[in-house]
């Protein structure tokens, strides 16, 4: 055949292929048109987090035995544990415990490997501040329990469950 005819046939095939791809994308767009919006109006509405959500760490000072397992299993050696050895009872006494949430990656290793369960993950995820030094929590700040989203009457909670198609 003539080169001009084969180029015209290739152009026609490319046009049909491009039209098919555009049509497929348009059909996907149309399939999303009848769904509910997934956007949450944040300050006034909040999603209820799952039970296994890894939020801010809660620390119970009385349970800690200063074994430093949390520091050893942390990938970035983040928790700072200050202790003093009591020679008369031959045990460690915890003086200070702090975590910098500006550096923490919320992996949960410290919670998982703690032998006394003095660490736990909460549902609190609003940790933003204007000063990064405010993200360094000591044992007093870590000991505060967060206000539950469900108990706050000023916020409409939205349960985040997967939709069941019928």
Curated annotation (Swiss-Prot):
[4Fe-4S] cluster 2 binds at residues 74, 104, 107, 110. Its cofactor is [4Fe-4S] cluster. Transmembrane segments: none annotated. GO terms for molecular function: 4 iron, 4 sulfur cluster binding; iron ion binding; NADH dehydrogenase (ubiquinone) activity; quinone binding. [4Fe-4S] cluster 1 binds at residues 64, 67, 70, 114. One of its GO terms (biological process) is photosynthesis, light reaction. It is found in: Plastid, Chloroplast thylakoid membrane. Binds 2 [4Fe-4S] clusters per subunit. Residues 55-84, 95-124 form the 4Fe-4S ferredoxin-type domain. The keyword Protein biosynthesis does not apply. Pfam families: Fer4. Keywords: 4Fe-4S, Chloroplast, Iron, Iron-sulfur, Membrane, Metal-binding, NAD, NADP, Plastid, Plastoquinone, Quinone, Repeat, Thylakoid, Translocase. It catalyses: a plastoquinone + NADH + (n+1) H(+)(in) = a plastoquinol + NAD(+) + n H(+)(out); a plastoquinone + NADPH + (n+1) H(+)(in) = a plastoquinol + NADP(+) + n H(+)(out). It is a peripheral membrane protein. The keyword Membrane applies. Its EC number is 7.1.1.-. One of its GO terms (cellular component) is chloroplast thylakoid membrane. NDH is composed of at least 16 different subunits, 5 of which are encoded in the nucleus. NDH shuttles electrons from NAD(P)H:plastoquinone, via FMN and iron-sulfur (Fe-S) centers, to quinones in the photosynthetic chain and possibly in a chloroplast respiratory chain. The immediate electron acceptor for the enzyme in this species is believed to be plastoquinone. Couples the redox reaction to proton translocation, and thus conserves the redox energy in a proton gradient. PANTHER family: NAD(P)H-QUINONE OXIDOREDUCTASE SUBUNIT I, CHLOROPLASTIC. This is NAD(P)H-quinone oxidoreductase subunit I, chloroplastic. It comes from Chaenactis santolinoides (Santolina pincushion). The lineage of its organism: Eukaryota, Viridiplantae, Streptophyta, Embryophyta, Tracheophyta.
């Amino acid at each position: 055949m003539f080169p001009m005819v084969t180029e015209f046939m290739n152009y026609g095939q490319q046009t049909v292929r491009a039209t098919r791809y555009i049509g497929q994308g348009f059909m996907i767009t149309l399939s999303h048109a009848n769904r509910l919006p997934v956007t949450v109006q944040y300050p006034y509405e909040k999603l209820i987090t799952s039970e296994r959500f890894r939020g801010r760490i809660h620390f119970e000072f009385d349970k800690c035995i200063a074994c430093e397992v949390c520091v050893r299993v942390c990938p970035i050696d983040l928790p700072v544990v200050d202790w003093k050895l009591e020679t008369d009872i031959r045990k460690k006494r915890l003086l200070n415990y702090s975590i910098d949430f500006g550096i923490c990656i919320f992996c949960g290793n410290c919670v998982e490997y703690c032998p006394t369960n003095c660490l736990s993950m909460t549902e609190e995820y609003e940790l933003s501040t204007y000063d990064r030094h405010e993200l360094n929590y000591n044992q007093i700040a870590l000991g505060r329990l967060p206000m539950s989203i469900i108990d706050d009457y000023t916020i409409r909670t939205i349960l985040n469950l997967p939709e069941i198609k019928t």
